[in-house]
């Protein structure tokens, strides 16, 4: 039986998942998105050509791969059409290879308006959302008033449901936030324009994946964002609105957890975060600037500058516990080139001097702890583009080994550059 692999982020997102999914899809037949929306930004570089995908699974650039958007994804019809057009203009066939669950909640203009209005009202306490309507769409889903892809296929019923939910949200927009109302006819017409296009791509995702599994076809599940942004396990409330952890596969794609064979955790050799929220190892100094500049740390979705800091082994151990991670892919090792010494956070010290090896459960708990560091020597040799482990400096090998010891998980893949070829594969998830 072929292997079913989950690829997910273990930090606050932006770990390099897109490249890794693209690298590994040479042996996958299906690639599935199971949570999030077009707030994701997965960057792929193939033969020097850069592609950024927000909604369509990264496997779309492989001719033999079928891509699926599962029910756990909140789907913006407008974003999907733009992404499809971008790919098709570059000669990538999309419509015949992309399948969508009719249970996907829709992101419509009023979700975006609510998202922007809320962040504006929060002022200095803004969460740092992408402003793309992700959170409000998930809220409607949980409140059982959300419109889904399947609703588009009956225009009369869709219009009635839209009017009801839009009345609620327009009241909030105008009376509470003092913003303009979202136009009903414009929203309805925009949705109906894409109904037939979406209908042609709809499948029963659970049944499709079950048949693929029984046929022995390898399936890859592509996570978005990262473990520390999980709605339940992240630095709440500075989190996203979906389950970014491995449990999201079962709920967001209808694929039973016992069918999963390997969980690949993508982790940077340092740490970054976009937007507000706790960040114990953040560096507001020359080293932090080095990481940001050399690592090109700007969000693929928002363009915002990412905050940078040292590797946090405490947070990483929690990611291992939650996700049952089989192996790591360590990315951006080359960004550490040239640093004389490196720091690894191995504990959090509280106000009484007690050192803990588990993170707080909520954001305000981080105000009461400080990181405890272990120092390791850096290296001056260039690791960019190295494709053999023996080609790495000894100090880099030692760093990798120490991360393995601290987390209890092997590093199976090392990424040394953005291109799919700039990679050291010590053990493929398909051969583990």
Swiss-Prot record:
Keywords: Cytoplasm, GTP-binding, Ligase, Magnesium, Metal-binding, Nucleotide-binding, Purine biosynthesis. Pfam families: Adenylsucc_synt (PF00709). The keyword Ligase applies. GO terms for biological process: 'de novo' AMP biosynthetic process; IMP metabolic process. Its cofactor is Mg(2+). IMP binds at residues 14-17, 39-42, 130, 144, 225, 240, 304. InterPro entries: Adenylosuccin_syn_GTP-bd, Adenylosuccin_syn_Lys_AS, Adenylosuccinate_synth_dom1, Adenylosuccinate_synth_dom2, Adenylosuccinate_synth_dom3, Adenylosuccinate_synthetase, P-loop_NTPase. Pathway: Purine metabolism; AMP biosynthesis via de novo pathway; AMP from IMP: step 1/2. CDD domains: AdSS. It catalyses: IMP + L-aspartate + GTP = N(6)-(1,2-dicarboxyethyl)-AMP + GDP + phosphate + 2 H(+). Mg(2+) binds at residues 14, 41. The keyword Metal-binding applies. GTP binds at residues 13-19, 41-43, 306, 332-334, 415-417. It comes from the Bacteria. The active site is at 14 (proton acceptor), 42 (proton donor). Belongs to the adenylosuccinate synthetase family. NCBIfam families: PRK01117.1, purA. Plays an important role in the de novo pathway of purine nucleotide biosynthesis. Catalyzes the first committed step in the biosynthesis of AMP from IMP. This is Adenylosuccinate synthetase. The lineage of its organism: Bacteria, Pseudomonadati, Pseudomonadota, Gammaproteobacteria, Alteromonadales. The gene is purA.
